[in-house]
Amino acid sequence: MKKNSFISVISDEKKEENKGSVEFQVFCFTNKIRRLTLHLELHKKDYSSQRGLRKTLGKRQRLLAYLLKINGVRYKELISKLNIRELKTR
């Protein structure tokens, strides 16, 4: 999980890192989710990490819903780059 290569992909119009962008925040949450998932495969009874994983999943879901509402094209690009599933719509 290389953070710097993805930062350059996200901020191709800007030369500086745009850490406040929705895409970067979703990217950081995705990395955290993957790390926690690997941790929980080894430590199945770590309930505090399970709670942290659920909270992080909820935060990422809210950010993705916001991005979908604001700009659907950027949402589609992001989920394809990060290789994550689309949101379930009600």
Curated annotation (Swiss-Prot):
GO terms for biological process: translation. GO terms for cellular component: chloroplast; ribonucleoprotein complex; ribosome. InterPro entries: Ribosomal_uS15, Ribosomal_uS15_bac-type, uS15_NS1_RNA-bd_sf. The keyword Amino-acid biosynthesis does not apply. SUPFAM superfamilies: S15/NS1 RNA-binding domain. Keywords: Chloroplast, Plastid, Ribonucleoprotein, Ribosomal protein. It is found in: Plastid, Chloroplast. GO terms for molecular function: structural constituent of ribosome. Its main location: plastid. Belongs to the universal ribosomal protein uS15 family. Component of the chloroplast ribosome (chloro-ribosome), a dedicated translation machinery responsible for the synthesis of chloroplast genome-encoded proteins, including proteins of the transcription and translation machinery and components of the photosynthetic apparatus. Component of the chloroplast small ribosomal subunit (SSU). Mature 70S chloroplast ribosomes of higher plants consist of a small (30S) and a large (50S) subunit. The 30S small subunit contains 1 molecule of ribosomal RNA (16S rRNA) and 24 different proteins. The 50S large subunit contains 3 rRNA molecules (23S, 5S and 4.5S rRNA) and 33 different proteins. This is Small ribosomal subunit protein uS15c. It comes from Spinacia oleracea (Spinach).
